[in-house]
Amino acid sequence: MGKSIYIAEKPSVAREFAKALKLNAKNRDGYMESENAIVTWCVGHLVTMSYPEEYDPALKKWSLDTLPFIPDDFKYEVIPQVAKQFQIVSGLLTREDVDRIYVCTDSGREGEYIYRLVDQMAKVGNKEKRRVWIDSQTEEEILRGIREAKPLSEYDSLSDAAYLRAKEDYLMGINFSRALSLKYSYVIRNYLKLDKCVIAVGRVMTCVLGIIVKREREIREFVKTPFYRVVGTVNVAGQTFEAEWKAVKDTPYFNSPLLYKENGFKQKKDAEDLVKKLSANGMEATLVASEKKKEKKAPPMLYNLAELQNDCSSLFKISPSDTLKIVQELYEKKLVTYPRTDARVLSTAVAKEIYKNISGLKRYTPMAAYADEVLNMGSYKTIAKTKYVNDKQITDHYAIIPTGQGMGALRGLSEIAANVYEIICRRFLSIFYPATEYQKLSMTLAKQDEFLFANFKYMLKEGYLKVATNRFARKKDDTKYSPEFIETIGHLKKGDILSLDKFEIKEGETSPPKRYNSGTLILTMENAGQFIEDEELREQIKGAGIGTSATRDGIITKLVNNKYIALNKKTQIVTPTFLGEIIYDVVYYSINGLLRADLTASWEKGLCGVADGSITKEEYTDKMNTFVIKYTNLVKGISNQNQITTVFDRTRVYYKK
């Protein structure tokens, strides 16, 4: 019987596999070997797609005459910087004494692609190949993954999607970047007085640039509208509260053109007229309705990568790429499960043994008491019946949760990594606590033929907030009225006459949209459907975002590196640069579809369809090639270069130094 080889994505993961397998292995150059097994590794990608000049040296020179460029057969090559490791891995995979290959690269589309390219370039052939699919790097999970490894062929559709994603990005990047650069780079170069200008566009990157630029322009174009609210101060036994006037149905101001909205006037004079009216005939109002009801707020769903990146941006002011690095570190140290996930739920299988994760947290001091309380409550036993467990909402991996293991690694974490681990643990334990309960009280007061409204709320039962409330978040002040006071006024009866101390006008103004920060931008990319007005189309791309959990942070980084956007490190606020807005305008007046979130999301939905077998790779390829050919030819026929600088001029005023 020959040897088995285990190929991981990086050396650190390979070492964990060797440790879990308890191999008495000797360290070699680029691999480890025992009597029965070999463990080796990639160092990320070892193989990449070849540049056009590898097809034809003449293609090295950029020319519209050679576009569109769509090869019949794509060429690949070993990345020079990692050629040595490729030769080692290639030699091991093709050794005659190796008869079984365990593919242990990251359990996802990109990890699949990394191995398949190596397999292709090494010409491995028909050896037995099995896919190890794991959700954490604990010894128990690694051994389960090996034990339950499926034939690699069962992941062929995922491989097809991975290849197509790469081909799509390659074709759009090569064709559109070359075409737009050849048409517009000299215009931009002259306009901005640059030495050179290459226009970089991409399926996802350009769409995200569009989202950022559109928001910036919405803010610029926003005109603040003042409005004037009327508020009465109600006095009950010496204690006061505010009641706000609103125009409701069958009252004089209902649907009046004088109103900005139901509780605010456009002009201060009209608000003053109302105050005069309400102040006449005594300062009393009648309680015409009072309603008490309890409200429950359930624990939030578990973290996926996007939600975690958003919270880390808000709480710790770190970028999505920094968050991913940290959670990847936590994963490799066995502290948390697989980070590049879109799911916010657990699988049924994991839910059955979730007590192990909870029990492990008893050894983590900040969460020990909560973990012990959850185990004593026994709520984990019925978690599978809740919304937090749903196999249908999981594609590759379940949500990011603590493994309950790896506690020895905590001492070596940076402060920020320890904080990220803490919020993951808090979110996880929250789902085993009951909902937070609030007491709500709403009151309606009548004054002549107008109505005033007051709403109150206080916490009855802390519920999950006991564990979810963290020391990093800014505390909200909900103590304006004490529970005792709210209880007191809650006993007032319909028909009671209440005293009014005064009426006053409170001036406000409408607010412009907020700029994205790195976290809200990630969430926006994940929820692309919000940009689609057509309900049917929105439903069609449900679950598809712009990019994937594994690529979104990299897209933001690429835009920053290209100087198309600026990311404030202190606030994590994202804004376009002047160059970024110019690139946006160039794309808007040429390949407008690249700026459309619905189109970008539909591409991602299509790739998901290839991965699950509902769309053939041939169907997707035809759609992709048609799109590239159509818009490359469209750009070739454009002749608006001389006019487009007038568009740039509109933006220049906002970037004058």
Where are these regions (language model features)?
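Intrinsically disordered, low-complexity regulatory segments
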Residues: 1-178, 265, 383
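Basic, low-complexity terminal or inter-domain segments flanking catalytic cores
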Residues: 2-5, 28, 93, 99, ...
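NTP-handling and nucleic-acid-processing catalytic cores
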Residues: 13-22, 40, 188, 194-231, ...
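OB-fold/S1-family RNA-binding modules
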Residues: 52, 97-102, 143, 242-268
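C-terminal or mid-to-C-terminal helical accessory/interaction module adjacent to the motor/catalytic core
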Residues: 74, 96, 139-234, 286, ...
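A conserved hydrophobic secondary-structure block that centers on an alpha-helix together
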Residues: 106, 311, 315-323
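Metal- or metallocofactor-binding catalytic centers and their adjacent structured scaffolds
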Residues: 255-301, 309
